[in-house]
Amino acid sequence: LNWSVKAIAEATKTKKMAGVNWQWNPVSKLWYFLKTDKDRFSTLCQGTGAYICDMWIEATIQICMERYGKPPALCGQFHDEMVLRSKDTPKARQIMEGIVQEAIERVNALVQMNTTLGCDVAFGKTYADIH
């Protein structure tokens, strides 16, 4: 595993601008601040994960806007999770799960990675119930 981490890190595109190092992320198409060269792999992984999560949340919002003319009740976002509020009925749960799953499908179409991204949906009254 260590050889692959090093190989992936070395394959990333970097540049120095105004004395600051930057790393290109081919998934997000963004340049990320690179504190040290040893951070290349983690910058790539964390930047990609944050971008995918942000796009997933954005797709969820877009779907709700398209269907209902308003965004979902987004209560929180933590690392790779989003917390939404909805009615506590079987129909509302089914609809919300469908929206969240469709949103990750849209992200898959956008990023076109060599693996299919997925997500789990959990329902509950507290964060402990859904985490």
Regions found by a protein language model. Give the residues of each.
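Conserved catalytic core of nucleotide polymerization and phosphodiester-bond processing enzymes
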Residues: 1-131
